[in-house]
Amino acid sequence: MKYQLLDVARGNRFLSRPREDPTATIIEDDTSSTTNSPYGSDWDIIWLGHCGSYSDPDTRRFVLKNDPTVPRVSDIMYPAGSPEPEELWKQPGTRIMYKSGNGVCSWTYAVSFVGAQKLLNAMSIEPFNQGFDQGLGRLCSSGILRCTHIFPPIFGAHAPAGGANRESDITGHRAGTKIREKGRTHNVLWSTRLNIKNILEGKKVEAQWDGVPDLNDEMKREFIP
């Protein structure tokens, strides 16, 4: 998780720069920049867990390559949409970060102080009659919130073993009496929920899909703007 959020911080600082900024095409550590946060200061939402998103007109992409925690493309679920260009994130071991135009499913998100103020205003003072995640997506697409997405997402919803209707309070009724033999965590290769017993017993964590190489202790990361 620390490795992943370090990558997210670098990507968010890159995307927070003005588009006309000539240094926005250069990846650097940014540790000399004046900021109150490792994630930068010019953002409202970092959407880390979702079930799909679309990019806004900003065509910049921060590409994270050689990430062993990225699921295979065949294992990724994104029913609500995916960003362009697909050829970037469909490369093995690759995630991309981008300025988001919309998103669905508020599984995990970070909010800046200013972003929290904007959310409170939008959802309590201004007219608001949507589900939270749909409303959050609308606030991103309208430009009220400055939002960054990562795809494939780092966090996913967990569907436990047992009755499939337990998966969601919204859509669980559609599952009827179907039984899920094994739990699953959407878009997470090494799921903490599925590995709780292994973690408690000091054993190696297991991927939730077959045919995945073991996770090395060290992640060798590469960044491409």
What do the predicted segments below correspond to?
Residues 2-225:
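An acidic/histidine-cluster motif and surrounding catalytic segment
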